[in-house]
Amino acid sequence: MGGGNGGFGYEIPPEALTDERFANMIREAEKYLGYPYVWGGASPSTSFDCSGFVSWVINNCGNGWNVGRQTADGLRSCCAYVPPEQAKPGDLIFFQGTYDTPGASHVGIYVGNQVMIHCGDPIQYANISTPYWQQHFMAFGRLP
């Protein structure tokens, strides 16, 4: 259950997996490590873009959520704002200015320790403390 990295460079800390909602999310998300980025993609059969991936994980992780297919900014509107110092595994992380669109332009799932799982190309873990992600950081959000 969860915690594996599929060879993609990050191991979820065991203590994070004691949160059942997060464990469910990461179990679903890790199924797709290595899937390619596909603009507009929103399911395993088409692969994913960033918001399609996060929407799929939210809707299919078994936590009883159904947000439909949202954009990154749409997902932001589904969440309550979380100050960065209170972010925890399972919160969503939003970025702006990663391409030319207003509001949130990229979204990932925060897994703790300054790392997110997201649909880059391919779906992978990424360190959010790099200059690129820090420059584009917008907010953390928590689903109800």
Sequence positions of predicted segments:
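Catalytic cysteine-centered active-site loop
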Residues: 35-89
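Intrinsically disordered, low-complexity
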Residues: 1-36, 85, 135-144
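Alpha-helix initiation/capping motif
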Residues: 14-18, 43-47, 130
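Extracytoplasmic/secreted proteins, especially bacterial periplasmic and envelope-associated proteins
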Residues: 20-24, 28, 49-52, 56, ...
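Aromatic- and glycine-rich peptidoglycan recognition patches
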Residues: 5, 72, 76-84, 99-144
